[in-house]
UniProtKB/Swiss-Prot annotation:
Protein name, entry field: Membrane protein insertase YidC
Keyword Membrane: yes
Source species: Shewanella oneidensis (strain ATCC 700550 / JCM 31522 / CIP 106686 / LMG 19005 / NCIMB 14063 / MR-1)
Membrane topology recorded in Swiss-Prot or TrEMBL: Multi-pass membrane protein
GO MF entries: membrane insertase activity
Length: 541
């Protein structure tokens, strides 16, 4: 009995430590004040717009152009003709606030904050590494819209160099998707060979993550190579060391809570994943592709993909078999993945994420019921042994070795395992932690309502009703479990305070997680009633 209570206390401390540790690990450095260009008129920037190529000259001259607007069923995008950068991206189907029409803006460029996606051609003859500045593309119109019945939308931009070479940059948007194809077509009509190299990078003002101890979230970069499936690269590390990792395939991304932007070059191409931080506090991460030689009279096509949207594991996996890892479940990912799958499965039937969480709770409690029954049976047997254990303590006094041997012989004789009731508690803790990360990381739960006052399962209960009910349920459970007479008085006081401690902790937890714990406690109370009734019939009162 005492060992089980100790394990419960240790479990609480362990969960608290994990949350505190994750919060410390994901804290970003303080933001650096910067001045960036206003979106109303797009401008090219200094040489930081273009990464270092194998050969090439940094860009220098700035220019101003009107933006090109692209609207699909999922995205509202603005493209700067200077370089063809995506300087604004709003997610039409994801709102900034629940119940309001304003879309969530992921990419933007304002006076105080920059978060944009850049791409271009560098190298010896790259149009974006010229000393005159980046290429200024021309478009047939400034507004493009995905029409009804249209599955894809092409936005072609054209640039004719001084030597007569035509460069076409085509953005291809898709219905129902957040990924954009960026295709370059180089028609070398000159008499000299060309050498170019495509790059794609994401530029963001260094900004701390909006997280708390109970809801830690990560804001920063991440990348994948052939040798490293997934690795976070926070802003602080980016400021200390620049990435320069050759790889086949790979990807580079910027992450924040629920959303991601990522460059995904072709999986079979030779690329280099790079990063840098400019003096103005702008963090860059991206890729440089292979160097292409374009002979006179030849045509060369170079492609890549860019994703800007929610952390949708299915959509991300379709682009790269490791991109779905940006949904980071931590060290218990192997347990969180099936929990997420089961959550999605239940929701597809009931159409309510709160009900799906309740069904997961019933599933977990049902699977653990045989162990729970064994736990309470073991506890009852241990209570019946208390007089004999007390007799052993009086007989052997301070001789702990002999008393320990006598206790083990007694347990063996009575067929009692003193640790037999601990397994359900040990199993519940990793399930609790895994579900915590599922509820924290799964974008599907963002703005997902349950019923009554719970309008968003991904945030804390606005009225703290669920945490208080959870505390009451813990108090009832505690009263149903008799306290061993041999238990230390200090431990008794600590256990009496456990419902209060848990309630305080859960005040700031996502309401979906509190719902899971509350329903679990209610089911546990019912199970205890059933088990105790069976034990009384067997005389294990």
């Amino acid at each position: 009995m005492e060992s089980q209570r100790n394990i419960l206390l240790i479990g609480l401390l362990f969960v608290s430590f994990l949350l505190w540790q994750q919060w410390q690990a994901d804290k970003a450095p303080k933001p650096v004040a910067t001045e960036s260009s206003v979106v109303a008129n797009a401008t090219t920037n200094h040489s930081a717009d273009v990464p270092e190529a194998d050969t090439g000259v940094p860009a220098a001259v700035a220019a101003t152009q009107n933006l090109i607007t692209v609207k699909t069923d999922q995205l509202d995008v603005q493209i700067n003709p200077v370089g063809g950068d995506i300087v604004y991206a709003a997610l039409v189907s994801h709102k900034l606030e629940q119940g309001k029409d304003q879309p969530f803006v992921l990419l933007e460029q304002t006076k105080d904050f920059t978060y944009i996606a850049q791409s271009g051609l560098i190298g010896r003859d790259g149009i974006d590494s010229s000393a005159k500045g980046r290429a200024i593309f021309a478009a047939s119109k400034t507004e493009f819209t995905l029409a009804d019945g249209q599955d894809s939308l092409e936005v072609p931009l054209t640039y004719v160099a001084e030597n007569g070479v035509t460069y076409t940059k085509v953005f291809v948007f898709h219905r129902g998707k957040f990924n954009v194809n960026i295709d370059y077509k180089i028609n070398n009509t000159s008499a000299a060979p060309l050498q170019v190299q495509m790059y794609g990078q994401i530029k963001q003002t260094i900004k701390p993550s909006e997280s708390s101890m109970m809801m830690p979230t990560y804001r920063g970069a991440a990348f994948s190579t052939a040798s490293v499936r997934y690795e976070k690269y926070n802003f602080e590390d980016m400021g200390k060391n620049n990435l320069n990792q050759p790889t086949i395939g790979g990807w580079a991304a910027m992450l924040q809570h629920y959303f991601v932007s990522a460059w995904i070059p072709p999986a079979t191409d030779s690329n280099t994943i790079f990063s840098s931080v400019s003096a103005g506090g702008l963090a860059n991460i991206g890729f440089r592709g292979a160097v292409y030689d374009v002979a006179p009279g030849a045509t060369q096509e170079i492609s890549s993909q860019f994703y800007v949207g929610p952390k949708d594991q299915k959509a991300l996996s379709a682009l790269s078999d490791t991109l779905n890892l940006v949904v980071d479940y931590g060290f218990l990912w192997w347990l969180a993945v099936p929990i997420h799958w089961l959550l999605m499965f239940y929701q597809s039937f009931v159409g309510n994420w709160g009900v799906a969480i309740i069904l997961i709770t019933l599933t977990v409690r049902g699977l653990l019921f045989p162990l729970t029954k064994a736990q309470y049976t073991s506890m009852a047997k241990m209570r019946n042994l208390q007089p004999k254990l007390q007799d052993l303590k009086e007989r052997f006094g301070d001789d702990r070795q002999k008393m320990g041997q006598a206790m083990m012989e007694l347990y063996k004789k009575e067929k009692v395992n003193p640790m037999g009731g601990c397994l359900p508690i040990l199993l519940q803790m990793p399930i609790f932690i895994a579900l915590y990360w599922v509820l924290l990381e799964s974008f599907e739960l963002r703005h997902a309502p349950f019923m009554l006052w719970i309008h968003d399962l991904s945030v804390q209960d606005p009225y703290y009703i669920l945490p208080l009910l959870m505390g009451v349920s813990m108090f009832i459970m505690q009263k149903m479990q008799p306290i061993a007479p041999t238990m230390d008085p200090m431990q008794v006081k600590m256990m009496q305070w456990m419902p209060v401690i848990f309630t305080v902790f859960f005040l700031w937890f996502p309401s979906g997680l509190v719902l899971y714990w509350l329903v679990g406690n209610i089911v546990a109370i019912i199970q205890q009633k059933i088990i105790y009734a069976g034990l009384e019939k067997k005389g294990l009162n």
